Amino acid sequence: MCLHWGLCNLARIAKLGDIRGGYNYVKLACSLLDKLESRECASEVICISTQVVSYVEPLQATLEYYDKGCAAAMASGDIFQASFNMFLGHTSHFFAGMKLQTTREKGEEVIKFMNARNVLIFNIPVQHMQNMVLHLIGLDEEPKDVSAGEENISENMKTSYYFQKLYISFIFRMFDDTKAYAEKFLAWNVSNTWVNLWVSYSFYTFYIGLVSFWVARNSRDEEQWYERGNKSKLALRKWAETSQWTFENKWFLLEAEEAFCNGNFDDAKVYYEKAVTSAKTHKFVHEEALACELAAYFYLEIGEANKAVDYCLLAHEKYQEWGAIGKCTSLFKYFEG
């Protein structure tokens, strides 16, 4: 810890497993920042510390920190840090389950800001996130840099590129594409430890877990995918210890999917309901919708059609509340089929 600048690099202790310890260092760093009036690095301290704070405080409550970080960067003339805060803020805005139209508008503002200042390093991953938003809303348009072929994607953009492909394939139930992009995402991120430093890593872990249990139920290399799903589940369970608000519902949903895989249907029923209730309590409407949808597939599989329909209708209602009209259409087509 640098007492002169109030820098919070020691908050990285949280990434070694001591999240509470890292959180305490973050609070100390931010208090030093205020006390010493360190304007030059304020935006960086806020941006980096928010990555740790997000593992303790409700995710929705952390969104304002990125706005503060951006304002601090602009006050000191640091366009790079302003863009960095905007990029990470937009990502958290999506994962926090804010209304999709609002997230879309926020993304457009971020892209416009970066284009005007030629900040390309964060522009493209923001466009990848926008592509997910547009698909969910039900629009055919794509941000201009998203349509580029995989071979044209630079190395440092592959994490966001593969994840948006994986996410869209999973949400719209395209099994083969989901499996293929999950394999590419996992292969790339084995050697890309930098991505593990950001709170978005926890959401990557969550979706990889869901994908893994789905693939495990439907492929010959079941054991490998089951192990991946279990690894994700254990990670979410650990994070739920420091932030029940943000991670409990995700952990419960992975427990449900694992129980489904193992044929423990009674346990699966309990955990699906827990996942739905927790997501509702903690105001993650998009994950409440997802938990209902996956519960519907489960009940359909075990022959309880009426229960499946109930969960499908609730999933549709919650996706609509989120603004995911494209997903609503896809969901009804799937169950009609």
Residue ranges and their predicted role:
Residues M1-C41, T50-L63, T91-E105, R117, ...:
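Inter-helical turn/loop elements of alpha-helical hairpins
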Residues L16, N24, A42-C47, E257-G263, ...:
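Leucine-rich, hydrophobic repeat-scaffold detector
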Residues C30-D34, A71-M74, K112:
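HEAT/HEAT-like alpha-solenoid repeats
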Residues Q60-G69, A73:
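Active-site/ligand-binding-proximal alpha/beta "capping" segment
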Residues E105-Q320, G326-G337:
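Helix-coil-helix junctions within alpha-helical repeat/solenoid scaffolds
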Residues G77:
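Conserved, mostly hydrophobic/aromatic
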